[in-house]
Design a protein with these regions (language model features):
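Gram-negative bacterial Sec-dependent N-terminal signal peptides
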Residues: 1-22
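Low-complexity, acidic/polar, glycine-enriched regions of mature
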Residues: 22-193
């Protein structure tokens, strides 16, 4: 009996590093410009305003053998908004819209992942923007992963969703309906820790 228990314990101990390799922690590589948070919103129905948030941090866990256990956490410096027009940025960041003085940070914390096909799925989570937290669902796709030229290991993903600005107490009622929602797009590489 002792021999069987010892063998089972040694086998479990030997397999533990393999499990740890699979369920890896990654830091999003926003510092080296391998990650982007972008948005697109209609301008009066005539064209689009496209912008980015340039300053953010985040991490995620990813196990290709247990996709349901994937998790993501991202923090965004709202003041890093950039639409390539300084006066417009100032207005968007003002109390008229994002009120960055009162709400300097936005965040996303995942609550679940549901695979839907080869490298694709639905990521659910809580998005906090303008001091309001709402559940969202984001369509995501695994772009790829592997070793990088610097001795690290990376995984890359992209995702998108649509947000109703009124859900975050951002008053856009004086604008046409086409300006009351925006498309959010994220793409990032994570470096395994």
């Amino acid at each position: 009996m002792f021999k069987k228990t010892t063998i089972a314990a040694l086998t479990a101990t030997a397999l533990l590093p393999l499990a740890q390799v699979q369920a890896a922690e990654y830091v999003i590589d926003s510092e080296n410009q391998h990650a982007f948070i972008q948005f697109k919103i209609s301008h009066l129905g005539y064209s689009y305003i496209i912008g980015t948030f340039d300053d953010f941090t985040g991490q995620f866990t990813y196990d290709p053998e247990n996709l349901e256990a994937a998790s993501v956490k991202i923090n965004v410096d709202v003041n890093s908004l950039d639409t390539a027009h300084a006066e417009r940025d100032k207005h968007i960041l003002s109390d008229d819209f994002l009120a960055v003085g009162e709400y300097p940070e936005a965040s996303f914390v995942s609550t679940g992942f549901e695979p839907s096909g080869e490298g694709q799925g639905k990521l659910t989570g809580d998005l906090t923007l303008h001091g309001v937290t709402q559940p969202i669902t984001m369509q995501v796709e695994h772009i790829g992963g592997g070793e990088d030229p610097w001795g690290g290991y990376r995984q890359g993903f992209e995702g998108s969703t649509t947000l109703e600005l009124a859900d975050y107490d951002i008053d856009v009622s004086k604008f046409p309906p086409v300006m009351q929602e925006l498309e959010l797009y994220v793409v990032f590489e994570g470096v395994r820790q």
